Amino acid sequence: MTQNTADTHASAQAQEVIAKMRTLIAQVRKHNNAYYVMDEPTISDNEYDQLRLSLIELEERYPELTQPDSPTASVGDNPLPSFSQVQHDIAMLSLGNIFNYQDLQEFMRRVNDRLSDADRNPEYEIEMKLDGLAVSLKYHNGQFVRGVTRGDGQMGEDITQNVKTINNIPLVIEAAQDIDVLEVRGEVLMPKAGFKRLNRLAQENGDKTFANPRNAAAGSLRQLDPAVAASRPLAFYAYSVNQGLPEAITLQSAALTWLKQLGFTVSDFERVKTAQQVQDYYESMIQKRADLAFEIDGMVIKVDDLTLQSQLGALSREPRWATAYKFPAETVMTTLNSIEWQVGRTGQLTPVGKLEPVQVGGVTVSNVTLHNFGEIQRLDVRAGDTVSVHRAGDVIPKVTRVWHDLRPEGTSAVTLPTHCPVCDSPVVLPEGEALARCTGELFCPAQQQEALIHFVSRKAMDIDGLGERWLISFFEHGIVKTVADIYHLNEHADELVTLEKLGEKSVSNMLRAIEESKKTTLARFIYALGIRGVGETTAQNLAQYFGDLPELMGASIDALEAVPDVGHITAELIYNFFRAEHNIEVINALQQAGVYWDKVEQQALDNLPLEGQTWVITGTLVASGMSRDDAKAHLQALGAKVSGSVSAKTSALLAGEKAGSKLTKAQSLGVRVVLEDEFLKMIGAS
C-alpha cells in the first residue's frame, strides 16, 4: 500500500468515525433537551445511557476526533426561559453509572488509586437513587429563600414559589438560625399512590395523563401557577448538604442524620465497607423496590468521609467519590436479527423477533413477540433494525421502539406469508381482523402439536408429567396424533421406556397421571378441546348453562348466544366445532377411553349466589387440601369471577394459611376476608 493510499484510507476512516460521532451527538442532545428541559423523555434512562456510552467510547478511542460541541462534558441542556435563571454557587453535578459487580469493583479500585495508603478502602454510604427532579434549597439564617432546579448544572431555574407548596419542606428551621447560608439538595418526587390518584382524576376530567411519576413531579414543578403545584402530591427527599454543614459533621451518613433532625425527609441509607456488602444491599433493594412508596432506579454509592470526598474531587460532569449503581434495565437496545413466523393451535400466525441476546431486567432475552402483521406495520420494523426491548417483572418482553435513523442499508419491509411456514397451506387474513391464520387446521402439524400441549395443560386436563418435550417427541414418532391417543399410551409402555431415555419410573408416573386425569369436570373438558374463542371462564359458563356435553353439542347458535360472555362470533365457532366430523370422532374416542365427569346441575347463570362478585385466593387451603385451581373452579361454579390481585373492586378474599401481602392489602381496603372453614361450608364440603 502506498503512502497516499494509506492516507486516503485513514481519512475515510476518520470521516466515518466523525459521522458516527455527529449522529450520536445529535441523539444525545435531542434527548438531553427532552429530559432536562421539557421533562418529557422519549426514551428510557438505559437507552440514553447506552447512547451516551457509545459516544464516550468513540471519543476515548479516537480522542483526536472528539467534537468541540460534544455533550459528554456537560450535565444537561439550557433551562427553560419562562423561569428566571439562577447561577449555582456550587455546580450541581450528575452521577456516573455502574451496572454490575465488576463495574462496582472497578469504581472502588479507582477510588483507592487516588487515595493515600492510609486512607484506602474507605467506608461507603449507600442510599436510594430516587427517580424525581434534582432541586437545591437555600436557607438564610434558617429561613427558606430559594429553590432552584439542576438545569445544566451551572445554571438552574428559580422555582421558589412552587417549592414552598411542598408540604414536607421546612420553610423555617429554628436549629439553623445561626447558619448564614444553608444549602440542602435533594429530589422532588411524586409517590406512587399520589401518581395513581392524579392520573385517575385526569382521566375522569378528560385531561392528559402523565407517563410516570418522574414526569408528573417535574411537570408539577414547572407550572407557572403555584396553585397547580400545590394541588399535586409532591414530596422532597434530601440527600446532601452543600453549604452550611457544621464542622463537627465529617461523614455523609452523619449529614443525613443531621438533616433528619432539622426536619427533612431522607431515604433509608446504609454504611458498608466492602464491595460484597454493597452488592448484598443492592440485591436486597431490588427485591424491596416494588413495595416502596416511591420509584427508585438504583442505589447511590458515596465515599462516606467528607474530607476524602474533597480529596477525590470531580470530573467536569460527575464526582469521583460517588456513582449510581443502576438496577437491571427494563428497557435496552439490541439488534433484531430476523423475524420468524410461528403457528399456534388455532392456526394463528405470530411473528417472533430473533434478537441479539441481551440482558433485560436481569434475564437474558433472545426472542420477542411482535404480536401480528399489523404491529409489524405499525412499528415499521425490519430484520437488521436496532430496537428497544422492554420487560418489567414477569411481563413478556416486547419491542417498544424501532431506531429508524440507525437502520442499515439494504433492509426490506416484512411481508405477510402467503402460505403456512409449517404445512404450506394458504394463509388468510380475514377483513377487519388483525390475525392471519393457516387454513390447514388438523392437517397442519404445528396446530396438531399445539392442540396436544393445550389439552394436557394445568387448567385443562392437568396431566402432570406429560410435558411439551415428550408430547412433541411422541407426535414426531407417530405414537400420538390426536388428543385421544394420549389415553392409549399405556399400549406403548415398552417403547416409551427406550424413547428419549424416559426410564421405567418416568413412564410409570406419566401413565398414572394420564389414568387419574380421566376423572375431570365438564368445564375442564370443554376448555381442553381448544375451541377457538372459548377460554376458561367461557368454558365454565357453558358447562353451567347446558349441564352436560350432549346438550352443548346440540345447541343452536341462538342458544349459545344466550350464555353470558358468548357473542355471535364465538357462538358460531362453537357451533361449527361440534359439527366437524373429525372433532366428533375425537370426542367419542376420549369418552370410549374412559374420560368422564359428573353432570353439572343446570342453573340460570344470573341466579348464581356469587354472580357479579370478584374473588381473589391467597395462601394454602390446609384443612381440605384443595388446590387453588379447584377452589377457583368452585367459586366460578357459584358465579364468581376469580382475579389474581386485590383491588378496591374485589368482593372477597379467600385466605388460607400463610396468606401474605394480598391479605394485608385486603384488610387495608376493607375487603371481606373469607377463611377456609367458611368457604367449605359455602360450597357444601364441610
Swiss-Prot record:
One function term, GO molecular function aspect: DNA ligase (NAD+) activity
One CC-aspect GO term: cytosol
Disulfide bond positions: none
Cofactors that this protein relies on: Mg(2+); Mn(2+)
Assigned keywords, A-Z: DNA damage, DNA repair, DNA replication, Ligase, Magnesium, Manganese, Metal-binding, NAD, Zinc
Catalytic residues of the enzyme: 129
Keyword Manganese applies: yes
Annotated Pfam families: BRCT, DNA_ligase_aden, DNA_ligase_OB, DNA_ligase_ZBD, HHH_2, Nlig-Ia
Domain BRCT stretches: 605-686
Residues noted as binding NAD(+) in the record, renumbered to the chain: 45-49, 94-95, 127, 150, 187, 302, 326
Domain of life: Bacteria
Function of the molecule: DNA ligase that catalyzes the formation of phosphodiester linkages between 5'-phosphoryl and 3'-hydroxyl groups in double-stranded DNA using NAD as a coenzyme and as the energy source for the reaction. It is essential for DNA replication and repair of damaged DNA.
UniProt cross-references to NCBIfam families, sorted A to Z: dnlj (TIGR00575), PRK07956.1 (NF005932)
Identification of the protein by name: DNA ligase
